[in-house]
Structures are given as C-alpha cells and as structure tokens.
Amino acid sequence: MYKRQVLFFSLNGFSQDFQGKAYYMSKTTVNMDWMKNMPPDRAKRIKSTMKNALEKNYILDFNSNSSYFEEEEVLEAGGGQGRGFNWMQFMTGPEGGTLHKDLQSNIYTNKKELFGKVFLIKDSITPTKWVMTGETKQIGIYNAYKATITKEVEEQAFSFGRRRAEPAAGSDEENTNPRLPKTRTVETIAWFTPDIPVSSGPSMYGGLPGLILEISDDKTSILCIKVVFNPKDKIKIKAPSKGKVVTKSEFEKIAEDKAKEMQEMYQGRRGGRRNNARVIR
C-alpha cells in the first residue's frame, strides 16, 4: 500500500465547460512464492521486470461529459518489450491501452494492441451498484466519500514451470474433480469527491457523483496524486478511431485463444517434437 501523499491542486474556478487532468499511480501485488526455488540472479531479473509492469503512472483527462485515461509515457532502457506477447499482461490482467468514456451516451472505447494488431473494444458502460457507507476522509483539500461494491472474481493462475498432469478423459479423477473455475469474493473500495463534478475515475471505475480519487480493488491500489483544473493548454478529449472494432466479449475470446496458442507453443518447446532430433528448450 502506498504511503500517504499530499495532493496538490491548481484551481482556476469551475464552469460548465471546465476540464482537468488527474494524475494517478497504480500498484498491483502478486504472489512471489513460485520463485522460491529459482536461481537468485534469475529471480532478481524477473522481479525487476514485474516491478515495471506492476507499478505504473496514469493520466485521466476529463470534462463534464467524457474522460480519457492512458498510461503516462516512460522511456525505458532497451526500448521496452516491444510488440508481441506481453506475458505480464496475461498474468496480471490489467485494463491496458487507452480508455475513452462518453459519459452521456454511456459508451466506452478501449484501444488495445495484441500481437501487433490494434483493437478498439467498444461497448456499453455497465452500471456499478455502489453502496454508500457514509464514511468520509480528507484527501488533499477535498472531502472524500467512501463507496463499496462486492463481486465474485475468477482466480487466475500462471505457471512458468511444468503444468500439473491433466486427468485422462473419462477417468475417475476427471469425473469426480471437474475443472471448474475457482472464484472468491472481492470488495472494491472507492473514495470520491463531489467537489469535482465528474462521474468518472481511473480505468473503468466510475458511476459515482464525483471524481474517484482512490481505489482499492483486491490486489490493486490506485491513488490520485495531483489534479490540475483548466490547464493552459486546452485538452482535446476524443475517442480513439484506428483499429479493428470489437465488443468486449469478442476481444476476450481473441485474447484467450492467443494465450492458449502461446501456452501450447511454450510446452512444445519444452518437450521437443517427436519428428525433430533437436529439443528446443
């Protein structure tokens, strides 16, 4: 969890056509137990890579009608991961890419890249059934109010080693232990301020009567560290337009198929090919 930081605000007054920028930092924690038996130097390299993937900064451009959320650009040594399979994205499952929300039509457009191909995920914003708790706290110069929602999430697993042997089709193990997805209950906590009259927030969070300044969602925490109103350079908020348009469910199916394809390729390299004398590891 973050150490508490002071929020700094630049205020130029509100009007119906006000706009602003909110700066957020996000941190996700993952279980590192799978690295216990790994050589120390290799574990150190992986942890460094994971740190870059799990700790990110974002900017939310907003006005009363729409918002645009994207990761803050950071130059990395070596040019980053480049195009291809982003295994960290499949491991942590973040809402990557850029995200535009039209708060009037209730439509979002999420621009994502997968294996070098650009997709525009366009779908309706699902209303969130927030529960107001009545709790308040001070965040910067603003009174923030607490809202929560409880949901069931499916456990995600990612293995870098050998997979557990699959039960044979029709065997007693398969019949008595069907491979059903494991789920657990997660509470999401949002702190929002009605003093900033924007029904939006970081990533897909929103639907509250004010800008969301802080989110605690299972293993991910998002904290707003700065808000600037009516910046000198006027903000142009537009939905991304280049890419293949798909629905959320269509994109999830594409990503799932690609993940399975990469997993099969990885297993094939580990086990080698029967008709090839050279074993690829």
Language-model regions, residue ranges each:
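Short, small-residue-biased leader/transition segments that mark boundaries at the very start
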Residues: 1-2
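Sec/Tat signal peptide C-region and signal peptidase I cleavage site
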Residues: 11-15
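Hydrophobic core
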Residues: 6-10
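Extended soluble regions of mature proteins
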Residues: 17-281
